[in-house]
Amino acid sequence: MLRKLWQWFYEETESSDDVEVLTLKKFKGDLAYRRQEYQKALQEYSSISEKLSSTNFAMKRDVQEGQARCLAHLGRHMEALEIAANLENKATNTDHLTTVLYLQLAICSSLQNLEKTIFCLQKLISLHPFNPWNWGKLAEAYLNLGPALSAALASSQKQHSFTSSDKTIKSFFPHSGKDCLLCFPETLPESSLFSVEANSSNSQKNEKALTNIQNCMAEKRETVLIETQLKACASFIRTRLLLQFTQPQQTSFALERNLRTQQEIEDKMKGFSFKEDTLLLIAEVSVSLGFM
């Protein structure tokens, strides 16, 4: 009996009701997605996307969301983001917009783009400022963003250092080349010796400038780390306050998750170098503003 039921589900349905046929195709796409057969699911969704009536808003949204999620899993993130942006522009209420923002968050997380992930979370928090889990995700994103930005700055500094060093060497040996490998100072004309002395002075200036740049970049990296840590810390504090607020209303596994998350936040807060006075001030500001 069950086998016949599945056979009916997979066979093409000959029906005069187009809506019924399209609905069946959508369910096939949903099943393929659940089985992680993303290419097959995408084909099912795409086959009905253009056939849906312009008045069938609900199914059209569901199908487009399914397409975007499949594209993200298949590594086609830009196409997925285009669909998500289109859905965001057409959102008519808070529920629709929330669904779209969670879709964008999933795509950006899959893309591992921390800055876009943070932007999506900020928009979600603007809609739902008292959701502790979004605040927790925002804190984690900031926690990961700091080292990523610091590494990018370090890479930029390293590249600039190599470029500057190469220019210094070239200015010191302006005639360098394969024929100059056997040249010695005593074989060079007197004018070249004066040129070497002048270039030596320029080299010292270049090295000093390079050192100043390196110091500046190091300060910038430290500033970036402190700033992102401060934002992560503030978001963690906000998460903890909201969890404490909802704690009396919870029981069973919900309460267990709440308490476990609070303990995890407490452990992560110990990794910050902020003084207790600073943490108390952040908490006071968070309470007084109602949201951050």
From Swiss-Prot:
UniProt cross-references to SUPFAM superfamilies, sorted A to Z: TPR-like
InterPro entries noted in UniProt: DUF5588 (IPR041404), TPR-like_helical_dom_sf (IPR011990)
Protein name: Zinc fingers and homeoboxes protein 1, isoform 2
Organism: Homo sapiens
Source taxonomy: Eukaryota, Metazoa, Chordata, Craniata, Vertebrata
Encoding gene per record: ZHX1-C8orf76
